[in-house]
Amino acid sequence: LPEEVRAAEKLTLPPWGMLTGVRPDKPVTWALMEGKTPEEAKNYLKEHYFVPEDRAALALDCAQASLRAKRSLREDEVSLYIGIPFCPTRCAYCSFVSQAVEKSFALMEPYLEVLLGEITQAAQMVKDLGLNVKSFYMGGGTPTTLSAGQMDRLLTHLNQSFDLSRCAEYCIEAGRPDTIDREKLQVLLDHGCDRISVNPQSLEDSVLRAIGRRHTAADIEKTMALAMSMGFRHVNMDLIAGLPADTPEGFRRTLDKCLSFGADNITVHTLALKKGSRILLEGQKIPTAEEVGQMLDYSISALRGANFHP
């Protein structure tokens, strides 16, 4: 392309160039699977979609990591997911199938009973097909909305129903600090859970209030200290860039605090405006695309600087 056109692109293109409606690592993954070298795959993203070098390098790292994970899988291995569709409150950005406990507490016990039956059926199916569970993840909702006793019943039945001897990762989304205590965490450890995910989304109290959370940043700090002291092998923290009331400076403070807690996984999402979310329905003001870009730029540099990799 003429030099003038390329100069104009630098001024007008968004951070991921012309990529729209596709995960940025997908074209790179396809290129690698077709036999291109990593450098060729990265250049394909730059030349065909005008993705800048830093984002193209990140997409390449993600693609290589996903292909390594895929190569480690065997044909007789499956992943197991259990969903617990209850939360203390419904977050403003949420569109998942989930209910606030205050409105649906009476449904929790019947749901658990039906779930135990489904676990029995699924375990028999896995056994009949000669399959092995490679990984287990419990999400939601917020699984730790269950009481310690309910969680104990659920995990006892799970471990008795499935052969988890080849399970490489046993992860439960602990989610929100207002649902986590020592007793529940001990139940998770006792049943073999080696990875939990604590999801503050932000450590700015103004942002937590804006998204409908009933806990504070100080609560998250206490929960992380407790979780880290109890010996979980891996602890993940989820953050969202672009939440109402957040700023690039506030997001930087959040990420820096997460790094100081010692979590060995940090997942940074960008806010997606979903049709059923309160943010969209109420027209809440959110950060600009430029501000979100600053949050993501800092995420890349700070996490790489702390030796985190995709």
Annotate each PLM feature.
Residues 1-3:
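Short, well-ordered secondary-structure micro-motifs within conserved domains or adaptor modules
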Residues 77-111:
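Canonical Radical SAM [4Fe-4S] cluster-binding loop centered on the CxxxCxxC motif
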